Regions:
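Central helical "cap/lid" subdomain
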Residues: 104, 108-110
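C-terminal motif of bacterial Sec signal peptides marking the signal peptidase cleavage site
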Residues: 14-18
Length: 257
């Protein structure tokens, strides 16, 4: 009898432990991952806007977290197609997004913003740059994005429209790196986006490019096919497209696509 009681008690303990384990491991309703964390790969030019959108998203979706990896769109695309864990990809170029879609790593991208090029110079404008054509002068030290990066492609289009040839002293991996070159005074000018000049504040000054010479780029976004957090990823995409997300983008200088 005593042996039976001990066995019964042991079974009761196991059953209780099993119920406790099942309860604690059950994910929240409507959320596939237990942690509620997504990783967003986003173009460097989205740094300020997406950081704020992420904060608002988390406030509106308690328990969910958005972590960001900002960088050159082409580099982020290569990481995704090489198997890097990501849940959302926001590119500064439809072409770069198409590379990811063609590889089967994303589908149904949606354009959520548009950006235009602008010349950035140090606050004191040491080279007296007044227009984009001044970048063709040999005396002006210019920083550009690498040609395969969206901001590099946009700059090339601007130069073609303006009928000038620019020989940069440095090629940078992304637009924020170009802006840093300007802010630190390493160069006299850099080709960035309107949003980057706004984000720089007093650290840089913008030189407007005439509409006839300027070029723009669209920003598409999609969930990554291999995501284990598709529900939250789709909610984040929806938030960026929502009036709240669009308001943040507009305040940062982005235009509607």
């Amino acid at each position: 009898m005593r042996r039976f009681a001990l066995i019964a008690a042991g079974l009761a303990t196991v059953a209780a432990a099993g119920c406790s384990s099942s309860s604690s491991s059950t994910p929240r309703s409507g959320s596939s991952p237990a942690t509620g964390t997504i990783t967003v790969f986003a173009a460097a030019s989205l740094t300020e806007a997406f950081t704020k959108i992420g904060q608002q998203f988390q406030a509106a979706h308690k328990g969910d977290t958005a972590k960001f990896s900002f960088g050159p769109s082409s580099g982020l695309a290569t990481q995704i197609t090489s198997g890097a864990p990501a849940d959302v990809f926001a590119s500064a170029s439809p072409g770069t997004m198409q590379d990811v879609v063609s590889a089967g790593d994303a589908s149904n991208p949606q354009n959520f913003a548009k950006n235009f090029a602008e010349v950035a110079v140090p606050p004191n404008n040491p080279a007296n740059v007044d227009s984009v054509t001044d970048l063709a002068k040999h005396s002006v030290k210019v920083a550009l994005c690498q040609p395969q990066v969206p901001c590099g492609s946009v700059a090339a289009e601007v130069f073609k429209n303006a009928g000038i040839t620019v020989k940069p002293v440095t090629l940078q991996p992304d637009v924020k790196s170009v802006l840093t070159q300007v802010e630190t005074g390493n160069v006299d000018a850099g080709m960035v986006y309107v949003t980057d000049v706004m984000a720089a504040g007093s650290k840089a000054k913008g030189i407007t490019i005439p509409a006839s010479d300027n070029a723009s780029t669209l920003y598409p976004m999609a969930t990554v096919s291999s995501s284990n957090h598709k529900s939250i990823a789709q909610q984040f995409v929806a938030y960026v497209l929502s009036p709240a997300g669009q308001q943040v983008l507009a305040a940062a200088g982005f235009q509607k696509p």
